[in-house]
Structures are given as C-alpha cells and as structure tokens.
Design a protein with these regions (language model features):
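Terminal domain-initiation and capping elements
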Residues: 1-111
Length: 111
C-alpha cells in the first residue's frame, strides 16, 4: 500500500476516534467529512443549541504533495502527535495552522 493510502486510512481512523468521543447534545449533528479523492478531512458539528446556530470545524486535515497538513485544531487533542504515534514520520506532517515564520521552530516539517 502506498504512503498516500496509508495516510488516508490513519487520518480517518484518528478522526473517527475523536468523533466517537464527542459528547455534543442531540440537537447538534457530529459529522466526519472524508474526501478521499481530493484528500480533505474534517470533523464538524452542525445544528442548533437553543436559539444559537452551531457550525464548527474542530479539526481539518489535508494531504498535499505527500505530506499531512494540519490546517485547524480547536480541540485539546494533539492530532499531529497522535499521527506520529500511529507511524507517520514527523517530517511528513506540516502544521499549516501555524504561520510559516513559526514552522521552523516546530518539531514538524516546515512545508
């Protein structure tokens, strides 16, 4: 199996685990969006909490040029570290949510 296919499976496994642990109320739908053709993966919550609209993307991960890009993380989880524990090389992870000038000081790939 090539690296891209492996990364797709690992990302989906990780996000599925996070989604299963989400304890949002019944009026809010927890969604796992997996576009395996374009390699975009998101954990979303959509719905209503009383009179307030809930529309949140908690984690957004892309695969670009053979690298995993963590685009957003509004959780207390560390998906980059979890992916490393699952076998992804640190140099194959880009913290896209960090500005480019900060990335050289991170333990992951710059871009």
């Amino acid at each position: 199996m090539d690296k891209r296919m492996t990364y797709r499976e690992l990302i989906q496994t990780l996000l599925s685990r996070y989604v299963e642990e989400d304890v949002t109320d019944e009026a809010v739908e927890v969604q796992l969006l997996c576009d395996t053709q374009r390699d975009h993966y998101q954990w979303m919550n959509v719905g209503w909490k009383g009179m307030k609209r809930v529309y949140s993307c908690f984690i957004h991960i892309d695969i670009k040029d053979g690298k995993i890009w963590l685009q957003q993380n509004w959780t207390e989880e560390d998906p980059a570290a979890a992916l490393v524990e699952m076998g992804v090389l640190r140099e194959d992870i880009v913290l896209g949510l960090q500005p480019p000038y900060k990335r050289p000081y991170m333990d992951y790939r710059v871009a």
